[in-house]
Regions:
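Conserved glycine-rich Rossmann-like NAD(P)H-binding loop of the short-chain dehydrogenase/reductase
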Residues: 32-49
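Conserved glycine-rich cofactor-binding loop
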Residues: 18-19
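Rossmann-fold cofactor-recognition segment
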Residues: 53-68
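Substrate-binding pocket helix/loop in short-chain dehydrogenase/reductase
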Residues: 99-100, 107-112
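Catalytic loop of short-chain dehydrogenase/reductase
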Residues: 137-164, 170, 174-177
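C-terminal helical subdomain
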Residues: 178-181, 185, 201-243
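Active-site loop of short-chain dehydrogenase/reductase
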Residues: 9-10, 84-85, 130-143, 178-182
Length: 243
């Protein structure tokens, strides 16, 4: 039976690590012994909320998903600090209410820039280094909205981008497979984060998923050996027929 991948000195990049799911992932992986490169637009907030993490095992770097140049700068800084890259967690994202009756073109453009183009750039820049790892991992945080359009309360723009993210994750799986790279789209339902504040139609607060639960799922995927690939991992907070 194949052993799972131990954290050892494996290096994981996590985008959007200053709040919500990203912060939970950072804290959980740090506790397991991973070396972390944490990216966020608000560097001051990132430094404050991750101050308790081991300083010798954590790099903090600016990553604004709307700024293409931040991608290469972050990758370069990660390699300069740790000398390797073993996993990428695409977590940074936004939710804007864009439907046929609400929102505007600028909001739709922001959704695509942050939720789709930014993780595409990160995967493209990280792939050569993940291939060299021999057991590279890409975990992209999608949504149950990646799998279906639930009802009229859902942001059409958001659902469109989350469907695209699922396609992106599957493409990454094919791109790196022969070199040991495995890609997983982790698809949480309503989670207790600021992202859902004031959004209609979501599961009420007490019934939402704890971000620490998502962090545990990410850690599980990162430890799986190459012969145990998980392409999609939906985690729902409500009863649905196919999710």
């Amino acid at each position: 039976m194949a052993a799972s991948l131990p954290p050892d000195d494996r290096v994981v990049m996590v985008s959007g690590a200053n709040r919500g799911i990203g912060l939970a992932i950072a804290r959980h992986l740090a506790g397991l012994g991973y070396r972390l490169s944490l990216g966020a637009r608000d560097e001051a907030m990132l430094a404050e909320v991750t101050a308790g993490l081991p300083p010798d095992r954590v790099l903090r770097h600016r990553f604004d998903a709307m700024v293409p140049a931040d991608t290469d700068a972050w990758i370069t800084a990660t390699l300069a600090r740790f000398g390797r890259l073993d996993a990428l967690v695409n977590n940074a994202g936004v939710l804007r209410q864009v439907t046929f009756d609400e929102g505007d073109e600028a909001m739709l453009d922001e959704l695509w820039a942050v939720n789709v183009k930014a993780p595409f750039r990160l995967i493209r820049a990280a792939l050569p280094h993940l291939r060299r790892s021999g057991a590279g991992r890409i975990v992209t945080i999608g949504s149950t909205d990646s799998k279906r359009y639930r009802d009229g309360t859902v942001s059409i723009g958001y659902a469109m981008t989350k469907h695209a993210v699922l396609a992106l994750s599957h493409a990454a799986k094919f791109a790196g497979w022969d070199d040991g790279v495995r890609a997983t789209a982790l698809l949480p339902g309503a989670t207790r984060t600021d992202l859902l504040r004031g959004i209609p139609g979501v599961v009420p607060g007490p019934g939402r998923i704890d971000p620490d639960t998502i962090a545990s799922a990410v850690a599980f995927v990162l430890t799986l050996p190459n012969e145990a690939a998980v392409a999609e991992l939906p985690i729902n907070a409500r009863l649905e027929s196919t999710l």
